[in-house]
Amino acid sequence: RDYDYVIHKLPDFSFAYYNKANMLCIQQDFKAAISYYTQAIQNDNDFAEAYFNRGLTYIYINEIDKGITDLSKAGELGIYQAYNLISRFQ
């Protein structure tokens, strides 16, 4: 609820969407989590952690190509461990 309140009050605050997505992953609501990661990325195109986590979530739900695309973007933005994960799924 707190994240929803923050998102309502500050709709451009990327970290609120990112944190809500992380919480949804813990609750195993992966499709909703992807939606919130996507909103975080739309608010901040350079949000490497959001690309990374969305990529992992895509891979978890077996959307490997989308996951690899996001992990690649996360790597470009400085999360170099993403490249190691990509090599496992190609």
Region spans (language model):
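Alpha-helical tetratricopeptide repeat
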Residues: 1-90
